[in-house]
Structures are given as structure tokens and as C-alpha cells.
Amino acid sequence: MARSKVIAIGASAGGVDALHDLVAKLPEAFPASVLIVLHIGAHRSELPAILNAAGPVPAKHATNYEQISSGQIYVAPPDHHMIVSHGRLRLLRTPKENWARPAIDPLFRSVAEAYGPNAIGVVLTGYLNDGSLGLGEIKRRGGIAIVQDPDDAAYPEMPGSAAAHVALDYRVALSRMPGLLVELVNGKAGKEAAMPNKSSQPEAEGVSPTIDGEKFDRPLALTCPECGGALLKSQNGTIIKFDCHIGHSYTGEVLASAQFDEMERVMRAAVRILNERAEFCLEMAEQARLQEPDAAGPWEAASKQALDRAYKLRVLVEQDWLMPETFGAMSGRPSRISG
């Protein structure tokens, strides 16, 4: 008996509407299981209720060690990665990947390993490039790689990145996605040949060693924005990845965004501390004036200096910053983010 298909879907910004529209057109008794990761972080999620109201295929938040069944939609719950292991769903609070938990890549990797050619990976609308590495792994193991046409997506970066880095089987508008999935699970649609599982070429002398098929370089003079651990660079196909010893993982674009967030946090904290110093120095000036009028001068000067530097630093934080995202960098048109 042929093994049933498993469809793994990843979405981020704009994903609620996209998932609603996709699920609304799936038929009752859909002969496959659907596993969904939406970037929701630790926030409460009403996605299963939204999907249940949209169409006939039942949806629920996954539970740990739950058996996977056909005709069911499983949604990763808040603040947990969802993966597949031995036909069951596992929910893990392991380190964030691509600045997200739940993240798409862990699900896609596990589905690729567990289901091989019976896996179907779908990347929908979203920012940055979570899902690109995992979709490549699904393709490498003989599965089917699909993205929402970036021109059709509310936020084209995520499907665009997957399209740029993975040999896709299908790139379709969202309106065509339900019909395509029905054809695929019923075996009525063809697909391109999958990428080879391993390169048959011997490793050249001087080439970086590999771990699970990824080439690793020496540790970098960069630290993890999440925990401060040293980062190790690796390359999977055309995608550069950075991992720390704790397990936090980033693509290059996500690391750039995470670095910016951390930089802004530290600079705003410095502004706050400078303002606090200015206030403290004024209080000390008042105390000094009670004992010796001339003694207040240095404290007042220190307060003025702190306020002046807090202002300059705040102006710096609130200036426009270049944020070379995937497509902006590729096209030579870097985008800007204003403070």
C-alpha cells in the first residue's frame, strides 16, 4: 500500500489570509495530512479556529507525540517548533531558528527525512527566507517543492528566496494552490526529477569539511544575537547559514536583521542610561549646593554632558539605516529602515 502524502506549509507575514484562502478550497476527506507553521512567536494563536471556519478539513493545534492522520490539519502551537519523528508530531522549545519559534525549516527538514518522496513542501507569503533551506532538503530527498508565486504574495521575500535557491517543481498563484495539492496527493500531477541526494564527486583538497551535507568554515568573529555565543558559518547549496553552539540558527539575511534589532536595543538602552545619569547628576548638584555653592558646578556640567550625548545618540538611532535584504542586495537596490 502506498504511503500517504504529507504536506508541510510555511508562512509568515500575510500568512493568516493566505492559509485561510488555501484551506477554504480543500475538499472534505482530503487524503493527506497538512502540517502548518506560521510565524507567531509566543503570541496566542487562533489559527486553528480560523481554518476550521474556512473549510471542511479539520484543523487543530498539534500536541506532543500525537499520531499523524490523513485528513487533518496540524498547526504548530505558539513558542514551539513542530517536527515529525516516527510518524508522530514532536513539539520542542529548542533554540530559535531564523529568529523564530516556531520556525519553518525544522518542520521541513523533519518531513523530508521522514517522508522522502511522499513529502510536499509549500512556502507562502512572508519576510526574509525561513523555509528556503528546508524546502531544498525536501527537494533533495525526492519530495515536491512548491512556492506561492512571489508576484502573487502579499510579502514576496520568503517565497522569492525559496524560488531563488531551490529547483522548484511548481511556482503558482495562491488561487491555483488547492487544486494543485489535490492533484498531487491523488497522483495526477507530474514533477521534475529531484536533486541528487549526495554529490558523487570526491571532496577537493582544502575544501571545508561537511556536517550532514553542510560545509562548515572556521568560527567567525561574530556572536549570536540571541545568546552571545560564537557563530559558525556553513553553506548549504547557495544559502549561507550561521549557527551557534547553543543551537540558534540564522540565514545571512535573518542574522543581519537580528543584528540590527540587537544594535538598536543596545543603543536605546544607552540613551536611557545617559538620561538617568543626567537626572542623577542634577540631584547630586542640589545636594552639593547645600554644602558649598561652588561644588554644584561639576555635577551640573556632567548632567549637561550626559543630556547632550543622549540627544546625539538618539538622533543616530532614529536615522535611516541601510538594510540589504535578499532581493534589494541582489538587484543593487538596498532598502532602508527608519528608526
Question: What feature does the model see in each segment?
Answer:
Residues P293-Q305, G328:
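Short, charged, amphipathic alpha-helical segments
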Residues Q287-Q291:
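Acidic, serine/threonine/proline-rich low-complexity intrinsically disordered regions
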Residues M1-E286, Q305-D308, L313-M323, R333-I337:
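Conserved acid/base catalytic micro-environments in cytosolic active-site loops
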